[in-house]
């Protein structure tokens, strides 16, 4: 780095060596005792070009910061220094000898140098020597003079709107006769001008350093030494090479405390205002501005994910499901209960269309515990009664879980139906959400008297009533679903056994008969039959023995003609493509059965 000796023109001044922080440029200082606004007259053309270049760079950085594009660490820390680098010829508010400051040689290293610039210009040396010449980059001896000279710089800034130069600038220290008055008068003069500043939006304010600023701004000269001493690097190069977050924040503190520029250059106005917003509102509570900046919250999982994960475990462990749901927020649990009801409804309808009784896939669970699934619900409802918000979402799920169980208990005893029906009723009454939210309850309870009327109108409950009564409506439903059978095997015998089973359902053997009922539907579920294969009438006359005889007959011709006579379609024997025992050629069928190992000869 080049060194240059600066010989100020003041009386009693002694030369001070200043280390330039730029690679190829050296700083020159002209110190005068009269106030002069021709601040750049003494600069060389190279230096002026550098200043113009830096001005453009900082202008672009400022516009970037206004649009929120620049990074948080570098930009807020550097922009205040950009303004602070402006001082060139500064009249002191005290009317003492003027201090002229020149910027150091400029290079495009704007961001880091600007962040490195302001703390290392302490005035200790100049103060002791009694001159207002440039000090070395040494530790800060008296920071009040530092603050004073920076405020003087800011007071003269409007004169040079185009010179944004964030390099380490040389600040002159006033004579040692006025070290104490310095901080007070510039601050007063600058605070008068603060009204012009436009506060930045809250998202751009610096929150952390405010407390330090507010503490240091109103204090007297003795206290003001604290903030600058936080940032005393050994040299400005060191500061440039380490523009870390902590340094930039501390730099921000000192700059915005000392700086109250009334009319900064146009390009930098929002940035300057941001830097000074904290000193302006030093009376405010610094914590009040911390709130808007807490933006990034961890995203919660949407409620349907919880629902999908808990659906399988709910049937097996309702208590666990309930405890998990009570932790959820009431809004989320409301959504969950709604979507859970929708899922159940869709499941019911799908089971109806397949002709299956509801919850047939888990008969063991509900059959083994027809009452135990209701009793825990009662206790749970009583626990939840103080919190109806939580009881509402949880109750529908429990109710719908217990309904199949209650229905099966009722199906086993339709004759004394009013007794069991009134049994579950008082148990479910403690939770108001049960009856209200689960619409199947009012219909499933009065089974015996209203069986015929309740069977057909409500669609969601028809799957439920299938299990619970043996009225003609039930046989209609079963007969309709029988058309889904692949073959007519055992159809009429199934209907006859159903008739025989109807008296059994009122006895204690209800569970066995119920399982007997389920097994054909399991067959139907595993072997779906195309709808184009005809209606139940086609299979009405088929008997099990007759079908076995047909299988064992040798003449496929006679079989096919039999099928044709029954089907009333005069087709040649081998053209039929029906997937039924009537039209299939016997040889193909026997071959297939042999391959499957189902036909023994």
UniProtKB/Swiss-Prot annotation:
Give compartment(s).
Answer: Cytoplasm
Q: Does the keyword Mitochondrion apply?
A: no
Q: Does the keyword Chaperone apply?
A: no
Q: Where is the composition biased (Basic and acidic residues)?
A: 203-213, 342-352, 585-601
- Which residues, renumbered to this chain, carry the PTM Phosphoserine? 131, 133, 519
One Pfam family this sequence matches:
SARG
Start-end of Pro residues biased regions = 415-429
What the entry lists under PANTHER family is as follows: SPECIFICALLY ANDROGEN-REGULATED GENE PROTEIN
Q: What does this protein do?
A: Putative androgen-specific receptor.
What name does the UniProt record give this protein?
A: Specifically androgen-regulated gene protein
